[in-house]
């Protein structure tokens, strides 16, 4: 073994590249002191870790969730943390639940993409698995839609496990907004409240703060926190321009958010996922949520494409839970559902049924590829 090396708190701990699916990758630099303090503290509190618990995050350690909440956060608490290589469908769709039963997992943390894929197969694959050891369920990587949340709660949590819908980013290092079991109650599709010391604010296009409730704005963080990335490796100017130039001295997350009357935050998606149709700003996340409420839909993705009259039109890529012959009827039903939930302006001009959506290793939809397909 090697003797431990004494490090300065601000010495680089690791460099992790992000956003390669949407543009030139950025090498985010995280440091020894602040990063490990914050991941340790958030892990223990958000997941309500107790000594002796068995914790499992299904992420790949090659992305930030794996770094923060498979390795550094759990291990700094002396936790038993499970590492998994594989997919939830092999050798069958009981794989996750067999592992939970085998090791007596207490905290389970996964992505909405995985939940939707498993929900698509129904609940039969859970019936013969003992999930009684579970105490806390978590989601990470993207907002979770209502249908997936309810399935997760009912069939995995047995209506008895709090669900922490965690919001954070590679750049933040650790969880910034989340419910906390026994402290801050969960709420379907909401990340809920900021973690201790985090001060999120909503801004309008001019940079003015939106202080009222039941409002939508651009999500920024008012003040620094211990695990914020310190720079982009070899390009500090790009770091400043990317995260701090839009709204002076505030960290701009790039996400939009809705704040309800109780101060709970719901992430509405990337602000660059807003499509202007006939002068109306339409966010893709609410439209996708509406589509996903259809009983036959497994998941969906919306992108814009040029339209000579509207400026932009909406193109929907939709995956069904199983094959159906009457696709035209389903497409009509989807647009009727969108009209009821959002309005006629949000109806899809084109709908393409697909067996799956292109995704990064972390489960995020690669909209850049979908835009290229839609524009042809």
Predicted regions and their residues:
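Conserved pre-ATP/AMP-binding loop-to-beta segment of ANL
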Residues: 1-17, 24, 48-54
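AMP-binding/adenylate-forming catalytic core of the ANL superfamily
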Residues: 101, 108, 225, 230-234, ...
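Conserved AMP-binding/adenylation subdomain of ANL enzymes
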Residues: 36-54, 64-107, 120-123
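Short Gly/Pro-enriched turn/cap motifs at secondary-structure boundaries
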Residues: 4-7, 187-194, 210, 242, ...
